[in-house]
Amino acid sequence: MSKTNPNKLYSLRKLKTGTASVAVDLTVLGTGLANTTDVKAESRRYQAPPRVLLQGKEANKVFEERKALEKQARDLGDTINHMSQTISEQSRKIAALKSEAELKNQQALEALNNKNKQISDLTNENAQLKEAIEGYVQTIQNASREIAAKQQELAAAKSQLEAKNAEIEALKQQDASKTEEIAKLQSEAATLENLLGSAKRELTELQAKLDTATAEKAKLESQVTTLENLLGSAKRELTDLQAKLDAANAEKEKLQSQAATLEKQLEATKKELADLQAKLAATNQEKEKLEAEAKALKEQLAKQAEELAKLKADKASGAQKPDTKPGNKEVPTRPSQTRTNTNKAPMAQTKRQLPSTGEETTNPFFTAAALTVIASAGVLALKRKEEN
């Protein structure tokens, strides 16, 4: 996510910090120059030169522009900080929404896959049990047929044995000469008895197999019933999971739509932030321009102070030279001295006459600037009058 450029914020703090010192300088310049419009010297009023008045107006204009830029910079800084917080909150919200949607979807898919695997395993196991049951059913049917056959064979052997025994008894009663035939019949009867015993044993074994197969079949049928119940429950759970998955997908689409909306808002906020940062950069450029203008005004003021000092020095040296021209002996010099003195008088009282700025008159720059400009105005007016 986008982060606020620390250089931009540093520039904003620097702009706010530098504003205070420059604003003080401009206040000094504007106030000092504005109050040089009229200078009283006893009963006369000296009008400041147009250049001084123009500089005062320019200083006031620069000061007002500076105040407007200060407010604009503060507003831009507050807006940028607010938008940076909004961008961070929206970024976190988008990430949380996406993470929540992915988690729900993943959980639903995992549960659905697990249930599908469980249903598949139960279906395979049920099929195997049914095959085993069919095998036992076939075994039971075969054993039943064999038992029936053995029972028929046993019944036939019993009938034959009974017939042989009856025939033997009849021969015994008829004649002793039929001893051999009786022995033969007795041998056949013994064979039939052996066959009958073998058939009974086989019949017992077949019955045991039949009972085992029947019990196993019942057991498998019970397992099949249990598996079918589990399968039905798993299918119902699968239906519920599918519904949950559909709901999760719908929620995911909803969250994705919300995320898309938030991303659009985020892009719009980023664009607005970029515009504000561009305005802040323009404000910084305007600040540099105003600082340059303030510096130029300070340099002009210093130059005027130098000119004033030079004029005062020239005036002082001119006043000390004696007038050697004969025709000029009666030129009055006292008015000049009076004017000079009257010019000095306001300079001495300037500190008391300066407008109140909310502070005591202890600012050396303010005192020097105001005195210099006022003195410059008076001396220049005096010089212009003497030249005329």
UniProtKB/Swiss-Prot annotation:
A GO MF label: IgG binding
Residue ranges of D repeats: 288-293, 294-299, 302-307, 309-314
Chain positions of motif LPXTG sorting signal: 354-358
Report if keyword Metal-binding is assigned.
Answer: no
* Propeptide span(s): 358-388
Comp. bias intervals (Polar residues) = 334-362
Which first-to-last residue range defines the signal peptide?
1-41
Q: Where along the chain is composition biased (Basic and acidic residues)? A: 322-332
Region (Disordered), start-end ranges? 308-362
Q: For the modification Pentaglycyl murein peptidoglycan amidated threonine, which residues carry it?
A: T357
Location within or outside the cell: Secreted, Cell wall
Q: Which UniProt keywords apply?
A: Cell wall, IgG-binding protein, Peptidoglycan-anchor, Repeat, Secreted, Signal
The main location class comes to: secreted
Protein role? Binds IgG molecules of the Ig1, Ig2 and Ig4 subclasses, and also binds fibrinogen.
Entry-linked PANTHER family: STRUCTURAL MAINTENANCE OF CHROMOSOMES PROTEIN 2
Q: What name does the UniProt record give this protein?
A: Fibrinogen- and Ig-binding protein
- Per the UniProt record, the source organism is Streptococcus pyogenes
